[in-house]
């Protein structure tokens, strides 16, 4: 009986993990679409800006950091007129998707040895 319960629990967790992976892939695709439309002009198509070195490099950043930054622009906790305007147009889902997309990209930042 214990083996059956363990098997069922393992099977269900596998199903949920597979579903989460599929949803994650969709989030990244949606995030790329939104980022291309709103963010790429300043932050670069690959999340590494070539326009102005003071613009943050977004590629490879932690998704929770990116999401928090966008939420802070929406709430006014972070101040930048351009970013506040763009962030105001984003839904919670958009923020999660864009954050997942940029986090999925390779980081250009390297530690010097």
Where are the regions that the model predicts?
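Bacterial N-terminal signal peptides that target proteins for export
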Residues: 1-11
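C-terminal capping alpha-helices of c-type cytochrome domains
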Residues: 15, 75-78, 88-113
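N-terminal signal peptide c-region/cleavage motif recognized by signal peptidases
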Residues: 18-20
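Sequence/structural segment immediately N-terminal to covalent heme-attachment motifs in c-type
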Residues: 24-47, 61, 111-113
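Gly/Gly-Pro-rich "capping" loops immediately C-terminal to redox-active cysteine motifs
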Residues: 32, 48-75, 84-88
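C-type cytochrome heme c attachment motif
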Residues: 36-44, 68-71, 84, 96-100
């Amino acid at each position: 009986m214990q083996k059956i319960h363990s098997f069922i629990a393992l099977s269900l967790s596998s199903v949920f993990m597979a579903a989460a992976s599929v949803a994650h892939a969709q989030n990244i695709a949606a995030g790329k679409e939104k980022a291309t439309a709103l963010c790429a002009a300043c932050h670069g198509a690959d999340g590494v800006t070539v326009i102005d070195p003071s613009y943050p490099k977004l590629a490879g950043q932690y998704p929770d950091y990116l999401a928090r930054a966008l939420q802070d622009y929406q709430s006014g906790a972070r101040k930048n007129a351009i970013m506040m305007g763009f962030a105001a147009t984003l839904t919670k889902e958009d923020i999660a998707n864009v954050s997942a997309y940029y986090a999925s990209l390779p980081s250009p930042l390297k530690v010097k040895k």
